């Protein structure tokens, strides 16, 4: 599943290609693409045409387009199109005569003739059109800030983590504590901070927890600079290009490879129906 850096790459692409343009029409081609929408696809199609995209925003793994009334020029958006990429969703900028993808689920046409496609092979992603509350779609108002958010309070997040008697990796994956972190970046930030994934959060100092959050920010900033992490053709930016941070991973998917710090072989253990990758020497459980 795309995590924070991958979604941010897509958001930036949509910002470049959509902001300032008016949506001429929308077409929802698969019911699952609007499965959370009251009224389904027709509700999106009927209410989005004629609106102008004023901004492309993101929180964690969710992104949305802020929409305003084009004729009136209203500058305070109260409506947004939420996009969740799911496991394999792609938002692609296409010319009108581009060959149709068999996995095209929804699309919008812009006033400059470009089309924006939502391509989703596994159909876990979706669009949702709804109200913004304090600038955030109602549907994701419960999602916490992420480590790249300028408003993120690492001290407050660290206190929240320390108050819980649970494995630190489990908490990092909880989108209501800190958002945008999935299995890849949890493993990477834990490796950088030299913390075992099963270490209980309440047994870590506040200083160590803040170091961990800073490690997450550092790792994700580097990943963003490299276009995110792509292991297959399902994750691409709006132009269809893959990221290359997979070449810089230190822990995730590095089973049997020497640790970049000490040379001990990275191991993988099952965790929450997925795998945790870590160095048994650098990341000892305390």
Curated annotation (Swiss-Prot):
Its EC number is 3.2.2.23, 4.2.99.18. It catalyses: Hydrolysis of DNA containing ring-opened 7-methylguanine residues, releasing 2,6-diamino-4-hydroxy-5-(N-methyl)formamidopyrimidine; 2'-deoxyribonucleotide-(2'-deoxyribose 5'-phosphate)-2'-deoxyribonucleotide-DNA = a 3'-end 2'-deoxyribonucleotide-(2,3-dehydro-2,3-deoxyribose 5'-phosphate)-DNA + a 5'-end 5'-phospho-2'-deoxyribonucleoside-DNA + H(+). DNA binds at residues 103, 122, 164. GO terms for biological process: base-excision repair. It comes from the Bacteria. Its cofactor is Zn(2+). A zinc finger (FPG-type) spans 250-284. HAMAP family: Fapy_DNA_glycosyl. Belongs to the FPG family. PANTHER family: FORMAMIDOPYRIMIDINE-DNA GLYCOSYLASE. Monomer. This is Formamidopyrimidine-DNA glycosylase.
């Amino acid at each position: 599943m795309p995590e924070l850096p991958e979604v941010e790459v897509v958001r930036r692409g949509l910002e470049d290609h959509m902001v300032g343009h008016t949506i001429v029409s929308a077409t929802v081609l698969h019911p699952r693409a609007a499965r959370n929408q009251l009224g389904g696809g027709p509700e999106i199609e009927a209410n989005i045409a004629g609106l102008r995209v004023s901004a492309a925003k993101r929180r964690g793994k969710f992104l949305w387009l802020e929409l305003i009334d084009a004729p009136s020029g209203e500058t305070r958006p109260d409506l947004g199109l939420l996009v969740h990429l799911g496991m394999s969703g792609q938002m692609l900028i296409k010319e009108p005569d581009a060959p149709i993808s068999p996995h095209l689920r929804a699309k919008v046409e812009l006033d400059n003739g470009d089309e924006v496609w939502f391509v989703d092979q596994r159909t876990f992603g979706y669009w949702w059109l709804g109200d913004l509350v304090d600038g955030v779609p109602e549907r994701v108002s419960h999602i916490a800030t992420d480590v790249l958010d300028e408003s993120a309070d690492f001290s407050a997040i660290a206190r929240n983590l320390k108050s819980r008697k649970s494995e630190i990796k489990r908490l990092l994956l909880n989108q209501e504590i800190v958002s945008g972190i999935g299995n890849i970046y949890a493993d990477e930030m834990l490796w950088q901070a030299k913390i075992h994934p099963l270490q209980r959060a309440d047994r870590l100092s506040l200083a160590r927890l803040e170091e961990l959050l800073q490690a997450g920010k550092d790792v994700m900033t580097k990943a963003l600079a490299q276009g995110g992490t792509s292991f297959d053709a399902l994750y691409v930016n709006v132009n269809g290009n893959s990221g290359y941070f997979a070449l810089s991973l230190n822990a995730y998917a590095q089973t049997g490879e020497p640790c970049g710090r000490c040379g001990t072989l990275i191991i993988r253990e099952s965790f929450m129906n997925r795998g945790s990758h870590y160095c048994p020497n650098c990341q000892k459980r305390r």
